[in-house]
Amino acid sequence: LMKIKFGAGGIASYFDKVKNQEILQTDKFFGGEVIQMTAPGTAWEKVMPVNMNDFDKTSLHEFKTVRAIETPLRYLVEKEAKFSYFTLRERFILNKFSGELIVEADVQNWTGEKARELRIVFPVNLDKSFKASYEIPFGTVEMGRDEIDYSILPENYECQFNPDKYGRKDLPYREAVNWADVSSGDYRGKGCLFASDMTVHLFRDETT
């Protein structure tokens, strides 16, 4: 159903053989590639934009294969890269019969370096007209259509909705309960459904 090729920092190609479509666009980042950015401030007291200071990514290091297994149901490839402050151990698991891809990432031997943020990148092969939706408690929200404009809320200095913390700006991230969907919005169109145990998802590239 699916064909995967690995590159220097993760998945170089995730090809749907049934639809004859390339799922990822990996000219800048690989699928599942881990990037490191500097995140000044704190998540609760002083929210500040991330920046490119001390930027790092998987493809800048040797990403060696430490285990490769095939079972009747799936393929598993485990790879490892040594960053400056930690060792990344990442597993790519492909279900043979559904095309489902599972990516598991472990950060080992972290040195405790402050103000660093790690992100896992999945560059879906879509143009800027894509539609994104995500799960919330008891429902689904589509970005740009169903969301509340938080900038019109009255100031409340006990939460994030005040000028010093929120700045009356559009949040770059979304908090999803279990899944986020990014697609062309067309019937039988391109896209991906991401089921994740991570809460915060970003839908635009903040690197320069």
Feature map (PLM): residue ranges:
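Beta-strand-rich recognition/accessory modules
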Residues: 169-208
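Acidic (Asp/Glu-rich), glycine- and aromatic
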Residues: 97-142
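Acidic glycine/proline-rich low-complexity segments
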Residues: 16-51, 128-161, 165
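Short structured motifs
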Residues: 61-65, 87-91, 136-138, 147, ...
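Generic recognition of stable, solvent-exposed alpha-helical segments in well-folded globular domains
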Residues: 6-9, 72, 100, 113-117, ...
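Catalytic and substrate-binding regions of extracellular carbohydrate-active enzymes
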Residues: 1-109
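Generic structural signal for residues positioned in beta-strands
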Residues: 3, 13, 76, 119-121, ...
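Generic beta-strand/beta-sheet core signal
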Residues: 7, 104-108, 123, 196, ...
